[in-house]
Structures are given as structure tokens and as C-alpha cells.
Amino acid sequence: MALGLFRVCLVVVTAIINHPLLFPRENTTVPENEEEIIRQMQAHQEKLQLEQLRLEEEMARLAADKEAEKEALERVAEEGQQQNESRTAWDLWSTLCMILFLVIEVWRQDHQDAPSPECLGSDEDELPDLEGAPLRGLTLPNRATLDHFYERCIRGATADAARTREFVEGFVDDLLEALRSLCSRDSDMEVEDFIGVDSMYENWQVNKPLLCDLFVPFMPPEPYHFHPELWCSSRSVPLDRQGYGQIKVVRADEDTLGCICGKTKLGEDMLCLLHGRNNVVHHGSKAADPLCAPNSPYLDTMRVMKWFQTALTRAWHRIEHKYEFDLAFGQLDTPGSLKIRFRSGKFMPFNLIPVIQCDDSDLYFVSHLAREPGGGTRASSTDWLLSFAVYERHFLRVTSKALPEGACHLSCLQIASFLLSKQSRLTGPSGLGSYHLKTALLHLLLARRPADWKAEQLDARLHELLCFLEKSLLEKKLQHFFIGNRKVPQAMGLPEAVRRAEPLNLFRPFVLQRSLYRKTVDSFYEMLKNAPALISEYSLHIPSDHASLPPKTVIL
């Protein structure tokens, strides 16, 4: 109780002592001048206002920066959206173009499929309307004039073609037999029977003297054999090598292409009868053949022609005592060109061309031709021209059986070839040859119906043939009839690699040689211009110099 009272008294005393009225604080100072206080407060207020303005400016700048950044982001987003839209549009356009190209390619593949043999030449609508082509306003003689010209000039000039063929074939048989007798079966080439090709064997020869073209296939002696390599078997081939191929000479013990031991791994208990374990195959070894190019296993065309000319010379010297005429090389720039020269002064030319068969087909690799279809020069001496002459003869023979009796297709070709040869003698040779005429005719035969080739339609078909040539010249495009042409009936037996190859343009040299192209076009229209007068002149009178003068000969 006493302790509690003491605590209360202590609190009261403490409160009295600490009351400010009784004991004021010693450190408390009252400002003497209120104006100084007000001035300081105003200065402080101004500082606060300045700071507030600075903060407001800073906030405004930050807001402007944010706005600019926002606008930049929006601009970038807009540009990105536009780029995406343009990229999407471009991708869409590219996709549409690709689809369009695929559709065109599929259509082209279907469009080029070969018709059945019984429908040969029934697609008349696939050709453009060539009969309305102007030919620069030049006109051809009517059918009556053409018929009279054909009977007087062409049929009469080629009446002895059969006798010429018979005589040349008999002599060549004897010559090749003598050649075989001089060759050794163990070391020399094996020469096979000749094959007649071109105009004399397709019945459209028109120029005199009548000229026989004969292929002479040959094979190497054992143990060698030929391995042909087509240009279309390679993915990338230069344009100047299209239509050519190479012929590799291989030994039987080096050729593993047809042997299973070169493709599979034999077990230890299996032995190849052709290639023993001790018989190591040396790929790419140098072929021991004098007809190959230096340091190459491929046949050289120049060496083959030199060998062939030497062999023919030896064979002729062996049998020359049996004949009362001389044999000479006709043209120095055309290997294989021969000429029989009688004592009366008359002569009979013919071509013997060494060839190599391409596998088991009717394609032949030709060393040289007097008139190369491509119109160009070969890239190297190991390039052999691929000839379709046997297929062309077979196609004309098969097609002729489906045409009406007395069809005018060969007459058209003969008249056109006659006009071209006369024009070449007037203005010199051009880039247009008889092979181009025949190629154009083959295309028309495949496109026209058989009924369109009746004899009374000679003038219409001749006009169409010349219009087709005109169109091809203007476009600088004349496709090879067999290479890449899927319209050709499969019954022809054309190799599938050639059938599916890229089409070969026979007029490709015109793209690179402008002067040759201009000369060819001018010569073509000059030929059309001279055709009426030339046909009329030869219909009334056949000049004695129907043939050109014989070139210089070299006696064997």
C-alpha cells in the first residue's frame, strides 16, 4: 500500500517538473525576423517548382521516347507484315508457276506418246495450218505441170536405178570377199556384209549420176569386242556432242559389265569361269588395238578410215585383173567415196562407209558421212555419228504399205530434192540438205492421214512440205525424227534410251552461225522463186549436163 502511494507521488512530482510553463527549454529559439523565414520558404518553394518543372520535362521526354519507340515498333511490324504478305504472294506465284510447268510437262509427255501402228499419220490436227502459209507470196506450178515435170525429168532419169544397184552390189560383194581373204581372223577386223541405205534404197534418188550408199559393218578380232556408249547415257553432254557416241574397245577378260562377278561378291567356294582368281581385271587399261586413239581405249574415226582405205586398195589390187575398168577414190575430203571409171569415159560413184552396230539394234555408228545430218563438225576423232538410216528405210517401207496406190510422198521428196540441188549449183551449198527434206517428210507422214497422200494431191503435199521447211527455218528448229520422238511406233524397235532422250534440233547450227542462217534462208526463198521457171524449162527440155562435173579422182 505504502509502495503504491509512493509511486503515485513520484509521478505527480515528475509531471510538475517537466511542465513547459514552469521550466522552458534552453535550446529553444524564436526567430527574430519573420520576413527571413518567409523569404526562405519562398526560395524553397521556387526550388520545388523548378524541380517539379524538371521532373515534368523529364516525364514528357520519356513519354515522347516511348511514343517514338512505339511508332518505330509499329512501323517495323507493319513492314514485316508487308514483307510477309509479299513473300506469301511470291511463294504463291512460284507455286502456281511450278504447278503450271508440271501440267505443261505432263501434257507434253502425253502429247508425245507414240500412236499405235494402225493409226500411223492420223493426227492431222496436231500440225498447224501450213497450207495457208504465204511463202512470201511465191506460188508453185499446178498439179498438171508437176506431173508432166516428174514424168519427163525425174522418172526418166532414175529409170536405170535398179540396174545400177545390181551392178554396184555385185562388185562390192566381190571386193569385200577379196578383203576378207587378205585379213587374218586372229589379228584383223572381221568385215560383214554391206547394207544399202539412203535415197537409192528408199526409191527417191533424183540426181545423176546415181549414187549408192553402202554401210560395211565390221567387228574386232577375238578376244576384243566393241562396247558402244551413247551420248544420251550421260546426264550432262555438250550440245555439240548430241547425236554422237563413242566406241570402247575392251578385251573379254576385262569386260565385267556383263559378268556377275563384277557386280556381286562371290564366296570363297565360288569361281568365275571367265575371270579366275589370278586374272586381275585392270579397268581403264590401254587397249592393244592400233585403231584406237593414242592413250585411249576408244576407236579413232581417222585411223579406222585409214585402215579401211588401205584394206580396200589391197583388195582391189587382188581382183583388178578380172574387170575392164579402174577403181579410184572419188573425193579426197570424203573417205569411203569410190568411183568406177570405165574405158568409155563414163563413171559410176558409190560410197563404202565402215560402220559399227550399236548393240543388237539397227542403229549404226558411222565414221564419216558425205552429208552429216547435224550440219556441224564432230568434237573429237573418237566421236562417231549415230546413223538412223536403216530405221528410216524401214519406216518408209512400212508407211508406204498403208498409203494409197501411187502415193505422192516420194514424188514430193524427189521434186524438193531436185529444186534444192539445182539451187545449190547456182548459189553454192547452204545449211539446208536433202536429209532435212527427208526429215520434214517423215514428220508429215506421221502427222497426215494415209488418204492425204493420194497421187492427185501432189501439189498440195509439195506446198505443205515447203511450208513446213519454211516454218522450221524461221523458228530455227527442226527436230530429229527418231531421237526423243515418242510418236514413233514402238513396233519400229527403236532403243528406249534413244526414244526417251531429249529431242535433237537439226537446225541448232543456225542459232550460232548467223551468216550461215542468212545464206540458207536467202537460198531457200531464191529456190522457191526459181522453181516455176526451172520446172517449166526441165519439162520441155532436159539439159545434157543434168549432173555436175566429176570431181578429181585418185587412182587406187
Curated annotation (Swiss-Prot):
Topological domain spans for side Cytoplasmic: 108-556
Coiled-coil region(s): 32-87
Entry GO CC: membrane; nuclear outer membrane; plasma membrane
SMART domains: Mab-21
GO molecular function: protein kinase inhibitor activity
Keywords: Cell membrane, Coiled coil, Glycoprotein, Membrane, Nucleus, Signal, Transmembrane, Transmembrane helix
Extent of the signal sequence: 1-15
Pfam families registered for this protein in UniProt: Mab-21_C
Family: Belongs to the ITPRIP family.
Function: Enhances Ca(2+)-mediated inhibition of inositol 1,4,5-triphosphate receptor (ITPR) Ca(2+) release.
PANTHER family the UniProt entry points to: CELL FATE DETERMINING PROTEIN MAB21-RELATED, INOSITOL 1,4,5-TRISPHOSPHATE RECEPTOR-INTERACTING PROTEIN
Protein name: Inositol 1,4,5-trisphosphate receptor-interacting protein
Organism: Bos taurus
Taxonomic lineage: Eukaryota, Metazoa, Chordata, Craniata, Vertebrata
